[in-house]
Amino acid sequence: MGKLKCAIIFAAVVFLSGCLYPNERKSSVHAIPYQDQLKQVQSAVDEFQKANGGLLPIQTKDMSTPLYQKYPIDFNRLAPRYIAEPPSTAFESGGDYQYVLVDVENDPTVKLIDLKMAEKIRDVKLRIQMYRQEHQYPPYKDVLSRDLFTLDEKKLGDGSSLTVTSPISGNSLPLMIDGDGEIYADYRTELASCLKKSKKTFKPGTEIQDMIWHETPFVPAFSVKYTVNDKQEPVFLENDMKKE
């Protein structure tokens, strides 16, 4: 009798879980960028390119668009002929990721941008704009590099963290600001991890931020340029702070 009672309670809990949390269950489906989805989109892009004389299924962006955000995949050109529908993780299907292409000249490769990161950066930029309406200058704190600074959380005053969650590791990446008020994520810890795992070495002055999309499913969106120092540690590329 006791076993039967436990079984009934367990079944009730499972049933209620399904009823009470449908949105959470749905969001989990849209949250994880599965490798097979990346492969599926890559195959569709390759087929489209072959069938269209080398053209790529991308949305048109302004030339000033940062490199890693410059070639978003246009699923309207892929579906339904080359792919049944955008993957569940894609923004177009209610997911958290934008599918983009990198290395478009040599080997067009499908990668991801985490749109939660983009949303957090937009929110921080709005808070800074509101701050500047009263104080004129952004809430600079410490100098990181030429024309690159940390932000003062206390001056912004709402208590929220000035970091974004890395889609690569789940770690918190500090946000930075330049003299024009643009916000960027600090990828040095992620690059250090990539360097350690790949065991590659670079000459100081060589750009290394592309390592992230070579080693992970993601592009380093909202990034500045990086290189290594003499100890093979990631540092900001001082002689060219052009943003990516």
Curated annotation (Swiss-Prot):
Organism domain of life: Bacteria
PROSITE patterns: PROKAR_LIPOPROTEIN (PS51257)
Name of the protein described by the UniProt record: Uncharacterized protein YphF
Source lineage: Bacteria, Bacillati, Bacillota, Bacilli, Bacillales
